[in-house]
Swiss-Prot record:
Chain's gene name: argG
Taxonomic lineage of the native organism: Bacteria, Pseudomonadati, Pseudomonadota, Gammaproteobacteria, Pseudomonadales
CDD domains: ASS
Name of the protein described by the UniProt record: Argininosuccinate synthase
Localization annotation: Cytoplasm
This enzyme's EC code(s): 6.3.4.5
Binding site for L-citrulline: 88, 93, 124, 128, 179, 188, 264, 276
Length: 405
């Protein structure tokens, strides 16, 4: 094995990463530093400390990254109205660059020469973690146990844990049949019955949202205040970024908003079915497009829409820390200078309905757009010349016999 003195492990305290911790100690004979991120996944993270201590770990990091996650990663992504392949709001993808960043920061603080993660060799996360790590610390060593060991089933992991005295729950409360990932933006479900693309997902799978059919019969209205493209207040009450998202998750979940069942194209080449709950993100996407509709210039809005799929792909495939993503982010952020105002929404049985938008910087001019008498604000006769000039190239082509029918 490569010479490794100290490694920082992205550690959840679960079976996989607990086995990895012991495996690193035995295989590399190295000191392990554990890092557990609180990204709003809704589970207690402190038990990870006790588990790590019981396994001889002396340097343990448990960091509350919720505000940084939403402020510096989720909000910048939503300024671009980012959606991967038309549906996926990138809840897992956007969390990985922050974890990679913190892994490298801790490696620098502790003098570690390697990092390790529990991502499998089949998924996107291995790419996301490692591209981020190499961008931030080019010489770092990366240990990916799932690409090295022969513990390729849950049963083998549990046998290894029992053999080495790692606390596990082989019996007890029923384990979810799905592979799940959660943070403040979303919760995802993969595997189990979802591996058959024709099988309908089970209703009791969902954790955050009620079924739209069982959502309240009375709609709820909500006002979101924007400043430079980011939400700063809900119903007039100013909130921090993480509080905004947590509140929207709760309200959206109550109204059955944000469920997805999709098949996506993984970066490693395979197709994968996943179900997602993103109630707050679904509301934010709809509201942000609404405030941009009155504050962005037409060509700026269209250019953003053209670039968004590329931006989304960069995030999905792990290139958050790349120069091209940073370049696109500067352009996106510059476009948000005038994206200020308030959007009013109606939430009803899984639907997010825009019912109003207003801004002191609105480019909507009712005097020009009106269907009534406009007092000469717009001369309709000007449209004739506009149309003729735009038709000129097509008329020339037609005169040359280049007819389309």
């Amino acid at each position: 094995m490569a010479d490794v003195n100290k490694v920082v492990l992205a550690y959840s305290g679960g079976l996989d990463t607990s086995v990895i911790l012991k495996w690193l100690q035995d295989t590399y004979n190295c000191e392990v530093v554990t890092f557990t991120a609180d990204l709003g996944q809704g589970e207690e993270v402190e038990p990870a400390r006790a588990k790590a201590q019981a396994m001889g770990v002396k340097e343990i990091y448990i960091d509350d990254l919720r505000e940084e996650f939403v402020r510096d990663f989720v909000f910048p992504m939503f300024r671009a109205n980012t959606v991967y392949e038309g549906e996926y709001l990138l809840g897992t993808s956007i969390a990985r660059p922050l974890i990679a960043k913190r892994l490298i920061e801790i490696a620098n603080e502790t003098g570690a020469d390697a990092i390790s993660h529990g991502a499998t060799g089949k998924g996107n996360d291995q790419v996301r973690f490692e591209l981020g790590a190499y961008a931030l610390k080019p010489g770092v060593k990366v240990i990916a146990p799932w690409r090295e060991w022969d513990l390729l089933s849950r049963e083998k992991l549990m046998d290894y844990a029992e053999k080495h005295g790692i606390p596990i729950e082989r019996h007890g409360k029923k384990k979810s049949p799905y592979s799940m990932d959660a943070n403040l933006l979303h919760i995802s479900y993969e595997g189990g019955v979802l591996e058959d693309t024709w099988t309908e997902h089970e209703e009791d799978m969902w954790r955050w949202t009620v079924s739209p059919e069982k959502a309240p019969d009375t709609p709820q209205y909500l006002e979101l205040t924007y400043r430079n493209g980011d939400i700063v207040a809900l119903d007039g009450v100013e909130m921090t970024p993480a509080t905004v998202l947590a509140t929207l998750n709760r309200i959206g979940g109550e109204h059955g908003i944000g469920r997805l069942d999709i098949v996506e194209n993984r970066y490693v080449g395979m197709k994968s079915r996943g179900c997602y709950e993103t109630p707050g993100g679904t509301i934010m996407l709809r509201a942000h497009r609404a405030i941009e509709s009155i504050t962005l210039d037409r060509e700026v809005a269209h250019l953003k829409d053209e670039l968004m799929p590329k931006y989304a792909s960069l995030i999905y495939t792990g290139y958050w820390w790349s120069p091209e993503r940073l370049m696109l982010q500067q352009m996106i952020d510059a476009s948000q200078a005038h994206v200020n105002g308030v959007v009013r929404l109606k939430l009803y049985k899984g639907n997010v309905i825009v019912t109003g938008r207003k801004s002191d910087e609105s480019l909507f001019d009712a005097n020009i757009a009106t269907f009534e008498e406009d007092g000469g604000a717009y001369n309709q006769a000007d449209a004739a010349g506009f149309i003729k000039l735009n038709a000129l190239r097509m008329r020339i082509a037609a005169n040359k016999g280049r007819t389309l029918v």
